[in-house]
């Protein structure tokens, strides 16, 4: 069964090594029959702790669709890429959002807030104070 995956890759920070490793990953994806491949460069960042004696790394997120049984073979191929420091592959779950329920919930919250505000306003009865108020009450 074809599933949608999202993978985060951490490469060495050197430009030439990064580009070469990224091309290897994309060729591996193509070899294992991945479709709808979308790649996003996140950036180069300092690592919290050294990974394989590297203090900085480049992050890349790649989304793709692939057969589930090809994934293990793809992961074994990733372990052979020299300049790839870390990777993480997740199944991307696509959920449809029911907008009617959201609209109802928002309306209920709005209605409840209006009711609370109107009750607060009704409990505040202004009582006249001062010399003008006694004149009004006497007439």
Swiss-Prot record:
Keywords: Ribonucleoprotein, Ribosomal protein, RNA-binding, rRNA-binding. One of its GO terms (biological process) is translation. The lineage of its organism: Bacteria, Pseudomonadati, Spirochaetota, Spirochaetia, Spirochaetales. It comes from Borreliella burgdorferi (strain ZS7). Binds together with bS18 to 16S ribosomal RNA. This is Small ribosomal subunit protein bS6. InterPro entries: Ribosomal_bS6, Ribosomal_bS6_sf, Ribosomal_S6_plastid/chlpt, Transl_elong_EF1B/ribsomal_bS6. GO terms for cellular component: ribonucleoprotein complex; ribosome. Belongs to the bacterial ribosomal protein bS6 family. CDD domains: bS6. Residues 119-139 are annotated as: Disordered. NCBIfam families: S6 (TIGR00166). Residues 130-139 have a biased composition (Polar residues). One of its GO terms (molecular function) is rRNA binding.
């Amino acid at each position: 069964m074809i599933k949608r995956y999202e993978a985060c890759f951490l490469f060495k920070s050197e430009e030439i090594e990064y580009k070469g490793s990224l091309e290897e990953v994309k060729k591996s994806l193509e070899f294992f029959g991945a479709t709808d491949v979308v790649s996003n460069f996140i950036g180069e960042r300092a690592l919290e702790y050294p990974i394989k004696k590297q203090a900085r790394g480049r992050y890349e997120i790649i989304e793709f669709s692939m057969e589930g049984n090809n994934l293990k073979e793809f992961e074994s191929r990733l372990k052979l890429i020299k300049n790839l420091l870390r990777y993480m592959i997740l199944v991307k779950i696509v959920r449809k959002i029911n907008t009617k329920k959201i609209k109802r919930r928002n309306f209920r919250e709005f209605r409840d807030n209006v009711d609370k505000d109107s009750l607060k306003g009704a409990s505040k009865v202004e009582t006249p104070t001062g010399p003008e108020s006694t004149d009004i009450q006497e007439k």
